[in-house]
């Protein structure tokens, strides 16, 4: 009997200790949350499967004290430091190994991301528009990192990243001082954005990116070519605006390319170099000063074709080859006069002839039953001239506004 009593007392004592510890832990957590909110203005959201912490306090210079408080609350998944004006370093973040995402967008004082190396669960890092950030070599040994966004980090001159085997998305938009890029360490990349990297002169290892689907090198005006581009068998979207490419043969060999954006290329006179792009559905050509003919347009272009501000384009002859085209935009083609071939685009839904001053009439509206919108602002067509026209689609809208 006495033995049973002792066992009961022992079990009861253990239960009391557990209850006390539980109450203490709840109080400790509550106090930590209160301090995070009062001292750092933290925003805390704890859902069933996600612990989010947002903080942009001017008191925040590093993460050491913040991390100490956060650990008393739990294991955070997402740390959002966007807009923190005084944050200089991420030192202290290493004490939060449960983090899957660290976001520090527009942190004007951030100069180092010390502490992120080796965080085992991290899948996303975003330091967009943190202009003082120059050294990112400490971003390494992150086995699960999928997305790295350094867009607008204008101080970065080189990229020495190691130990990122899972990296799929690399965003370097507007890193204007970045000189060279070696992609050999990132064979799994799916998206690469270097748009606006005016100082970039070479991209090595491009041809080895067998899984790349999106490539944006627009306004990376220091590049003179894209060696290896023809090997990008999975590429779907390619943006080359304001990048002078001497040889388009590699691009013409991309079997899955669906969207091609180009602009400012002086070498393009016709679309014949692109005619082999059987999967292409959208074609954007902007301000190509010598484009004179649409002959050779890939026949599969159906969702959108735009040839805007091309001063030598005088006729739309050749466009009829893209018989399934739904949206045609020739805005700003000041010398365009002949639009008759549009009548053969039986699937056309919208056309823009804005600022095409030599276009005086739109007889094609009589033959296109799917056409819904004709944009004519600043063209040579006057409103009175379309009154009473027999329309294939009685609900057709003529829009004479000019949008800048």
For each feature predicted by the language model, list its residue ranges.
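Short, conserved loop/helix-junction motifs that constitute active-site signature segments
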Residues: 367-368, 390
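Small-residue (G/S/T/A) turn/hinge positions that recur once per unit in extracellular repeat modules
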Residues: 41-42, 275
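Ser/Thr/Pro/Gly-rich low-complexity linker/stalk segments immediately outside membranes or between
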Residues: 24-39
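Concave beta-strand-loop units of leucine-rich repeat
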Residues: 49-62, 68-88, 92-111, 115-134, ...
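N-terminal Sec-pathway targeting helices
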Residues: 1-13
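Charge-rich, solvent-exposed alpha-helical interaction surfaces
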Residues: 32-35, 65, 69
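Terminal hydrophobic membrane-targeting helix
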Residues: 44-47
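Hydrophobic alpha-helical membrane-insertion segments, chiefly the h-region
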Residues: 14-23
């Amino acid at each position: 009997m006495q033995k049973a009593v002792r066992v009961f007392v022992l079990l009861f004592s253990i239960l009391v200790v557990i209850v006390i510890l539980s109450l203490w832990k709840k109080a400790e957590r509550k106090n930590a949350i209160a301090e995070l909110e009062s001292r750092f203005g933290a925003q805390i959201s704890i859902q069933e499967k996600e612990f989010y912490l947002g903080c942009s306090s001017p008191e925040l210079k590093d993460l050491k004290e913040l991390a100490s408080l956060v650990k008393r609350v739990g294991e955070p998944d997402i740390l959002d430091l966007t807009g923190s004006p005084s944050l200089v370093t991420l030192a202290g973040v290493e004490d939060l190994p449960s983090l899957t995402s660290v976001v520090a967008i527009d942190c004007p004082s951030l100069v180092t991301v010390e502490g992120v190396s080796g965080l085992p669960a991290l899948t996303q890092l975003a330091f967009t528009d943190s202009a003082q950030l120059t050294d990112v070599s400490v971003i390494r040994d992150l086995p699960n990192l999928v997305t790295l966004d350094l867009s607008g980090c204008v101080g970065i001159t080189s990229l020495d990243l190691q130990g990122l085997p899972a990296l799929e998305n690399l965003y370097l938009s507007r890193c204007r001082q970045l000189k060279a890029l070696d992609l050999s360490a990132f064979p799994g990349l799916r998206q690469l954005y270097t748009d606006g990297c005016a100082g970039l002169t070479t991209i090595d290892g491009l041809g080895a990116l067998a899984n790349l689907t999106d490539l944006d090198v627009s306004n990376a005006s220091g590049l003179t070519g894209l060696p290896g581009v023809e090997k990008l068998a999975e590429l779907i979207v390619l943006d080359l605006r304001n990048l002078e490419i001497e040889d388009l043969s590699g691009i013409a060999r991309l079997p899955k390319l669906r969207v091609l954006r180009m602009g400012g290329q002086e070498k393009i006179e016709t679309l014949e170099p692109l005619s082999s792009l059987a999967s292409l559905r959208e074609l954007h050509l902007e301000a190509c000063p010598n484009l004179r003919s649409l002959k050779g347009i890939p026949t599969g272009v159906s969702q959108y074709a735009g040839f805007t501000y091309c001063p030598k384009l005088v006729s739309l002859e050749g466009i009829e080859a893209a018989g399934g085209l739904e949206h045609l935009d020739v805005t700003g083609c000041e010398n365009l006069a002949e639009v008759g071939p549009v009548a053969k685009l039986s699937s056309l839904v919208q056309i823009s002839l804005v600022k095409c001053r030599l276009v005086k009439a739109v007889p094609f509206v009589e033959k296109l039953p799917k056409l819904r919108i004709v944009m004519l602002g600043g063209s040579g067509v006057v409103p009175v001239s379309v009154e009473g026209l027999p329309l294939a689609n009685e609900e057709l809208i003529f829009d004479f506004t000019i949008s800048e």
